[in-house]
């Protein structure tokens, strides 16, 4: 998130996490994959891999909503009032934002629209989603889908975090390990290709700019407050959050390396 380095100054433990991740994030944002995104085919292949990270991000935030609010019947109050409010507001934007035509859509669906417009293949991700619907099981569905092992490792890590039921860890990975990792360079590459008439990428540019806009103005401050609320003064929780963030950022880098390898075949 663009404003995170300013906001972390308000809490020493948040500073610790941010400092811990600076080097890893710089390496990720300057990854060589962005140097080879020069053609329509490059961007298509990138999106065909990256869409799985977009999908499992939605499961990450929904896990927080499930744990921090009451989504069961009959309803009962939840003790996490502040964190619950914050996560509900974040879910509203992530799950029910608007597209270029003003229609309500999740950010995942916005990304699929972008893939369709740019000509990226959506067969594998759609097949995976259908298996999720049929099986009602992530583990069974991912094992039945022919995915690269690194993409599977990336998603398996996310679900390991979710299954830990440690809300402070889930919130921290959501905040530091996922929201802040769309490099400006990628957006500029897409804009450049779009201006050269090589691709029609209105939906993708909208998705990327919308993601950054919502994050900078709303999700960044909300997510930081949520981490403070969930970790409190517990040093063990802060340590667990930092370790998970470090691994999440490294796996983000590995996920991009796979896309880079595809380009070099």
Locations of regions flagged by a protein language model:
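Non-heme di-metal
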Residues: 2-252
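Single conserved hydrophobic/aromatic residue that forms the stacking wall/gate
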Residues: 251-265
């Amino acid at each position: 998130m663009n404003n995170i380095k300013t906001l972390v100054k308000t809490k020493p433990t948040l500073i610790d996490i941010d400092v811990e991740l600076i080097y890893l994030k710089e390496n990720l944002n300057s990854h060589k994959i962005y140097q080879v995104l020069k053609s329509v085919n490059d961007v298509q292949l990138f999106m065909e891999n990256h869409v799985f990270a977009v999908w499992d991000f939605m499961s990450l935030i929904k896990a927080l909503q499930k744990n921090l609010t009451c989504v069961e019947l009959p309803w009962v109050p939840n003790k996490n009032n502040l964190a619950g409010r914050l996560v509900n507001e974040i879910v509203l934007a992530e799950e029910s934002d608007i597209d270029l035509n003003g229609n309500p859509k999740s950010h995942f669906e916005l990304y699929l629209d972008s893939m369709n417009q740019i000509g990226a293949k959506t067969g594998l991700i759609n097949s995976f989603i259908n298996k999720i619907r049929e099986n009602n099981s992530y583990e069974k569905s991912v094992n039945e889908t022919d995915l690269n092992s690194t993409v599977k490792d990336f998603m398996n890590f996310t679900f390991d975090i979710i299954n830990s039921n440690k809300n402070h860890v889930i919130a921290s990975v959501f905040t530091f390990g996922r929201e802040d990792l769309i490099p400006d360079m990628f957006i500029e590459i897409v804009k450049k290709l779009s201006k050269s008439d090589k691709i029609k990428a209105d939906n993708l540019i909208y998705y990327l700019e919308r993601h950054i806009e919502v994050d900078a103005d709303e999700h960044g401050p909300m997510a930081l407050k949520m981490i403070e609320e969930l970790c409190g003064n517990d040093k063990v929780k802060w340590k667990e959050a930092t370790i998970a963030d470090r691994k999440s950022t490294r796996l983000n880098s590995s996920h991009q390396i796979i896309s880079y390898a595809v380009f070099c075949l």
